[in-house]
Amino acid sequence: MVKVGKLVEEQKAAMEEEKEVNAEAAEELEEAEEASCNGSKKKVVPGIVYLGHVPPRFRPLHVRNLLSVYGEVGRVFFQAEDPFVRRKKKAAAAAGGKKGAKYSKDYTEGWVEFRDKRIAKRVAASLHNTPMGARKRSPFRYDLWNLKYLHRFTWSHLSEHLAFERQVRRQRLRAEVAQAKRETDFYLRNVEQGQRFLAADGDATRPNSSWTFTQRPTEQELRAQKGARPGGRERARLATVQDQARSNRGLLARIFGASLLAESRKEP
């Protein structure tokens, strides 16, 4: 499995290199065609280099000073880090005893425009994976350049991409605000409804909303009701006497019936 993974990675790397070579060849053909059409006048086309790693406290002025040695540098743009990540870093610095004023905003990536794309290609190919600082006392001496030339990429493409990201961020923020507003309204409605219920429980003018159920009277309740009527006590006493007589009669029948049966068995 490890060998298969290595083979797949090698194939991907080879395909990427082939794409870059084809793109460079296509650009060289375009340059040759432009040169043949214009004769001795060559049109200078700007090129953009992507900076994938930006060290802490590395600013656009630093990259302009470092790269302007190799050619004329035009526009430079650095993408600031996410505000949430910055707040976490500030909190960690404050928890570690560091002053928050010393922490400055950092960047995650950048784009550098050269006036001539041939110089941009040469700079990206020669400075990639080399130390950023040439002097020993430079704070970026142990950081390496991570440069890549962007084929057929113009500054307008970058502007469109950044505008799209801003629009997406605004839409996400609007959706989060709307969701928070819906949750707040739902909570307030529940609170108001609970307050109305509490006020209704303490209001004596409102009818009681409790449920009542009627059940059939039991035998004991019926006897008690009959006993409470006039003449009912006598009937109840007679009923109890009759019940006792029935029980006594049955008991005597069982006793004497068993004795008579035993005597009949003894007689031959």
From Swiss-Prot:
Biased composition (Polar residues): 206-217
Region (Disordered): 200-242
Coiled-coil region: 6-38, 163-193
GO cellular component labels: nucleolus; transcription regulator complex
Major localization class: nucleus
Location(s) in or outside the cell: Nucleus; Nucleus, Nucleolus
Keywords of this entry: Coiled coil, DNA-binding, Nucleus, RNA-binding, Transcription, Transcription regulation
Single GO BP term: spinal cord motor neuron differentiation
Leader peptide range in chain numbering: none
Gene Ontology MF terms in the entry: DNA binding; RNA binding
Boundaries of every RRM domain copy: 47-144
Family to which the UniProt record says this protein belongs: Belongs to the ESF2/ABP1 family.
Oligomer status and interactors: Interacts with IGHMBP2. Interacts with ESF1/ABTAP.
Function: May be a novel TATA-binding protein (TBP) which can function as a basal transcription activator. Can act as a regulator of basal transcription for class II genes.
Protein name: Activator of basal transcription 1
Organism name: Rattus norvegicus (Rat)
Gene: Abt1
